[in-house]
Curated annotation (Swiss-Prot):
GO terms for cellular component: cytoplasm. PANTHER family: METHYLTRANSFERASE, RIBOSOMAL RNA LARGE SUBUNIT METHYLTRANSFERASE H. It comes from the Bacteria. Specifically methylates the pseudouridine at position 1915 (m3Psi1915) in 23S rRNA. Signal peptide: none annotated. Keywords: Cytoplasm, Methyltransferase, rRNA processing, S-adenosyl-L-methionine, Transferase. This is Ribosomal RNA large subunit methyltransferase H. It is an enzyme of class 2 (transferase). It holds the Pfam family SPOUT_MTase. Gene3D superfamilies: 3.40.1280.10. Its EC number is 2.1.1.177.
């Protein structure tokens, strides 16, 4: 299985890079992982709604340029489905069974995802109604993907 994470924003913090490296190493037993890091657009402090929309659309075009036709796209979105780790594991497993072996997770920038990216998504997923820094969220996502594979294989980790 191929897992791709497309994320807007550069990872700067060393501790987050170390966590990403650790989960990337752990996931290498289960899948081929690719992380695509895209630059985020600078948002002015007092940006208007129109300016924010333009920024999301610009980031969205960049995201869409990285998505291939054969990718099963999961958009990380506050309006998405909230599911348990077990159901997440089953979802990933079912993707493989249905022939969707190229799963792509999309993490937007600080303003979220454009409507075009949301429309392209095959599934919308929400980890929480709380807001997280998108750099930290990348670590959280990889941990949940790792947990999902461990659950799938009935290996100890998840409690």
């Amino acid at each position: 299985m191929n897992i791709t994470v497309i994320s807007v924003g550069k990872l700067k913090e060393k501790y987050l890079k170390q966590a990403i490296d650790e989960y990337s190493k752990r996931l290498s037993r289960y899948c081929k992982l690719e992380i695509i890091e895209l630059p985020d657009e600078k948002t002015p402090d007092n940006a208007s709604e129109k300016e924010e929309l333009q920024i999301k659309e610009k980031e969205g075009k960049l995201i869409l340029s990285k998505i291939k036709d054969n990718m099963h796209v999961i958009a990380m979105d506050l309006k998405g489905n909230e599911i348990t780790s077990e159901k997440f594991s089953k979802y990933i497993e079912n993707c493989g069974v249905m022939g969707n072996s190229n799963i792509t997770f999309v993490i937007g920038g600080s303003l979220g995802l454009s409507q075009e990216v949301i429309k392209r998504a095959d599934y919308k997923l929400c980890f929480s109604k709380m807001t997280f820094p998108h750099q930290l969220f990348r670590v959280m996502l990889l941990e949940q993907v790792y947990r999902a594979f461990r659950i799938m294989k009935n290996e100890p980790y998840h409690k």
